[in-house]
From Swiss-Prot:
Pfam families per UniProt: ABC_tran
Protein family according to the UniProt entry: Belongs to the ABC transporter superfamily. Ribose importer (TC 3.A.1.2.1) family.
Positions that bind ATP: G37, E38, N39, G40, A41, G42, K43, S44
Name by which UniProt lists this protein: Ribose import ATP-binding protein RbsA
Predominant place of localization: membrane
Subcellular localization, as worded in the UniProt entry: Cell inner membrane
Matches recorded under InterPro entries: AAA+_ATPase, ABC_carbohydrate_import_ATPase, ABC_transporter-like_ATP-bd, ABC_transporter-like_CS, P-loop_NTPase
Catalytic activity: D-ribose(out) + ATP + H2O = D-ribose(in) + ADP + phosphate + H(+)
Gene label: rbsA
The EC number(s) this enzyme carries: 7.5.2.7
Source species: Escherichia coli O6:H1 (strain CFT073 / ATCC 700928 / UPEC)
Length: 501
């Protein structure tokens, strides 16, 4: 089959690092090509070379059979290559239709914007995606999942021949994911080629026809998905067998450290639970169940309307994240790029940002040598892959950014560490490293709350699991009681903790 798009022998180097070496990718009409590899394998760099953001150092790009070089995203878009980025690229203050047709609005014969046509065309695109809202709604009023769907509608509006989807389901619910897959199947029937970049094995085996594997910037293999198993694909990605994906540390927890009684706040209704020293408490539930809201009320980012929180026997009141930090409660956000990291700052600055009081003299000046030593120790301990601590953190892979975010939380020497989706957007190899770090913290007696949408992760890592449903606690299970079935039953409200007991 003739490929719509072919990249062969692509090289790309940056100061101190060779990002791509002999990389290759083919995209075929009417087929979905998965592009997989650990974070830092070169997937994002390859997409930037393809769309003209980066100039390739060597190699060829064939588009519809002709050798081509795109000068930037606009030229690749106009040629018929659409890309849906992992980071949403929308303007919250504009309507959905205005976002979709930004810069190419429909104009009537008097030179004025034809709003009626524009909204009608945008509504058609939303209907194609089976979405329940109209295009006159402000993007800022949508959930992250719905905003992702608007991104997809925007790319569809260009009638692209090849569509690149970078982690498209990262923020989508199961229903939204099913809508996306329905659209992908429709696009295949229309003869479009799709590049599907994802870490989610289940999705790759469900929706993709072929898979290209990158490792350390090199092309490893192109295979038909049907010829592979999950284990064989992971082995190609990491270059080794992953024996035990969730390395649970079997160590009995200590005394109660945190006690939460009848906690209420935005999206949180009368929640009570305990957390022990050296315990990993998993928090499960569907998207919108109130898991993140519960954590934000707990550490002070959302207002607490009633209830009590006791830490080591003393009542704590957290009216702001600073109060949470001061009391030894650290929260690592699910959205590290919005809430967690300052992308323009260096690895060192990001890591030490909340712990500067430990490196400050009485007069307020910094003890730079102490700060550098601490950052250097954490980089080594966490195996953060970076050319230096002065590197801008935005240039690191997702897994390495996440390690820096966790290290920053630990620098403040917390008693309770809340990890909200700690492995979202992180590849299989880096996930295992993060799990091993979590176990290390547990062994040191740290109390950990692990919030995750990935049930195998919650089941594999937790000592005890609580489940949220519509702002309430709908279940609490020991490690032995917990299965995917009971967690899902509690998550949809079919089972409550009283039934279980």
């Amino acid at each position: 089959m003739e490929a719509l798009l072919q990249l062969k022998g692509i090289d790309k180097a940056f100061p101190g690092v060779k990002a791509l070496s002999g990389a290759a990718l083919n995209v075929y009409p009417g087929r979905v090509m998965a592009l997989v590899g650990e974070n830092g394998a070169g997937k994002s760099t390859m997409m930037k070379v393809l769309t003209g953001i980066y100039t390739r150092d060597a190699g060829t790009l064939l588009w519809l059979g002709k050798e081509t070089t795109f000068t930037g995203p606009k030229s690749s878009q106009e040629a018929g290559i659409g890309i849906i980025h992992q980071e949403l690229n929308l303007i919250p203050q504009l309507t959905i239709a205005e976002n979709i047709f930004l810069g190419r609005e429909f104009v009537n014969r008097f030179g004025k914007i034809d709003w009626k046509t524009m909204y009608a065309e945008a509504d058609k695109l939303l209907a194609k995606l089976n979405l329940r809202f109209k295009s006159d709604k402000l993007v800022g009023d949508l959930s992250i999942g719905d905003q992702q769907m608007v991104e997809i509608a925007k790319v569809l509006s260009f009638e692209s021949k090849v569509i690149i989807m970078d982690e498209p389901t990262d923020a989508l619910t199961d229903t939204e994911t099913e809508s996306l897959f329905r659209v992908i199947r429709e696009l295949k029937l229309q003869g479009r080629g799709i590049v599907y970049i994802s870490h989610r094995m289940k999705e790759i085996f469900e929706i993709c026809d072929d898979v290209t594997v990158f490792r350390d910037g090199q092309f490893i293999a192109e295979r038909e998905v049907a010829s592979l198993t999950e284990d064989s694909l992971i082995e190609m990605m990491v270059g080794r067998k992953l024996e035990d994906q969730y390395p649970h540390l079997d160590k009995a927890p200590g005394d109660i450290r945190l006690k939460v009684d009848n906690l209420c706040g935005p999206g949180v209704n009368d929640v009570s639970f305990t957390l022990r020293k050296g315990e990993i408490l998993g928090v499960s539930g569907l998207m919108g169940a109130g898991r993140t809201e519960l954590m934000k009320v707990l550490y002070g980012a959302l207002p607490r309307t009633s209830g009590y929180v006791t830490l080591d026997g003393h009542e704590v009141v957290t009216r702001s994240p600073q109060d949470g930090l001061a009391n030894g409660i650290v929260y690592i956000s699910e959205d590290r790029k919005r809430d967690g990291l300052v992308l323009g700052m260096s690895v060192k600055e990001n890591m030490s940002l909340t712990a500067l009081r430990y490196f400050s003299r009485a007069g307020g000046s910094l003890k730079h040598a102490d700060e550098q030593q601490a950052v250097s120790d954490f980089i080594r301990l966490f195996n953060v892959k970076t050319p230096s601590m002065e590197q801008a953190i935005g240039l690191l892979s997702g897994g390495n950014q996440q390690k820096v975010a966790i290290a920053r939380g630990l620098m403040t020497r917390p008693k309770v560490l809340i990890l909200d989706e700690p492995t979202r957007g992180v590849d299989v190899g880096a996930k295992k490293e993060i799990y091993q770090l979590i176990n290390q913290f547990k062994a040191d007696g740290l109390s950990i709350i692990l919030v995750s949408s990935e049930m195998p992760e919650v089941l594999g890592m937790s000592d005890r699991i609580i489940v949220m449903h519509e702002g309430h606690l709908s279940g609490e299970f020991t490690r032995e009681q917990a299965t995917q079935e009971v967690l899902m039953a509690a998550a949809v409200g079919k089972l409550n903790r009283v039934n279980q007991e």
